[in-house]
Amino acid sequence: MDSSLEIKTITTLPKEYVNQNISVFNKVLSSLETISELAKDHLKSITSKDGRISNSLLEKHQFRAHGLAWFETYRIGLRETFNWIKLLQDTKNDTDLEYAVMVYAFSEYLNQMRYGIMISQSEVIRPSTLNVDDEKFSFFNSPDVQELIKYGASDNISQIMISSMENGIFPNLGLNDDTL
């Protein structure tokens, strides 16, 4: 994460922020999908022989394969968190707490996906590991995405989540199962 990131006190509640910026979340998810396809195509090209995945080539490029798996876990996690919010909206079970969780996740994961996902103390997956040019992450530098990252990293978002948990209030999982 950029240490010069200025974190301001927020005045817009998370639910309102997300609803006002839904197109930003869609843009992020679409951009990450494009990056994912490029990374998968590259990995397939360097691990295939005679039209099939080669065990020896996969072993040779294990770090990249492992890195792509981590990247995909983050990308799909963001997509499904976004879908979770849509489900909660549709069933009118959404509160600011769930939106706070989502914007926090987008802020944290986007920074890691852009600058490096630490998979161990000595291994960091960066876009270059996946053969992704910086240009493909240009969406990250747009003012609306930078605002999302700042908003999600704000003390107010953290405080909403911490305060809720301290008071025994947890996010609605939206699983429609009364036993959970």
Named regions from a protein language model:
Residues 1-180:
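Flavin-dependent oxidoreductase catalytic core characteristic
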